[in-house]
Amino acid sequence: MQVCGHVGRPPFPPSSSGKAREGSRRIPTADAHLLRKAGIIGDAPSTITGGWIIPFSVVEEKTAGLRRRWIAWPRDKNRDDPYEANFPLLHISHYLPPVMAEAASCLDFKASFFQVSLPRETRHLFRCRVEDGTLVELTRHPMGYKASPEILQIITSAIAGVTTVVHRLWAAPSLVRIDVWIDNIRIAGSKSDVTLWEAQVLRNADGRHATIGEERESGATHYTFLWVQFDHTHRAVSLSEKFVLSVCAMPALNSSTIAEMEVMASRFLYAAAILCTRLCDYHFFINAVRRRLPAIHQGIVLETSPANLPPAAVGLGEGLRHTIEVTTVSESSSPQKRHWPPHHGRIAPWLGSRFYSRLRRR
């Protein structure tokens, strides 16, 4: 898949920082061999280097076990590029109503970022060296560039047939609902309509030489999507075990940094939509978090600075964490207990999305 043509502007404008600065991190020789073999990097031609990447790896927990993900971070370009990514990732409450449908199919792209080819004229912006000194450049879409999620969201939406992205002749029928989250697709509706459009999406992906992950749900009534467990049989939703474990693993709010506090607050708002929690009861905690975020933008504090939340705010936050833990434990012992998605007229989804946008405002 090519980046150009999917985004209506040059995706990688020239850097404004002047002379590019080479990073100190290099790709291990063994890793470089594998990346070359996979077609992710190639030897750089004798043209001027426009930008450098910082290569590193992280370990992710997947259903099949631990997986190492290689990331190319163009730090200077992310800082100097004036373009700000814009893609419609909405509050989780927007993705709950499809549980009322009969069934759904869930698909995702395998190694999605590396499936997108970089145009040759942009590859000089993403270079680094191997341990032996060889100069190489990316040939595939870099995971770490700030516009990458938007580009992939557009490509995935086109393959899924989202009506706001493709021509009506190639759009999904009105009988199914399509939800796209970067490289994840959910098709909801009647089981026959869902499986029919799923087959078309697979043909679309094959036509663009895009590889779909092996672990996909086809016409399912029970599945996990965006850290939420969907039960179409009982028309109910609940927090996934992985999400709850991530909340339990977060440090205590009375000793957290500002960055940890922000992550915890965003997950609280996420869970509130699933549990139908009244966020008005936690206004003091949310307001305390919101007041600390502009200080990062203004350079007053660092993300690693202590959050120093007031004791009352800490108590509210830890109380919500306890609610998440207790609710999940009770659900595991009593499977019949479920949360129904809030109706459009109720306060939970509206407050959740509103406060989430205020949290991110700096």
Which positions does each model-derived feature cover?
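Catalytic-core region of right-hand nucleic acid polymerases
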Residues: K19-Q153, N204, S238, K242-V289
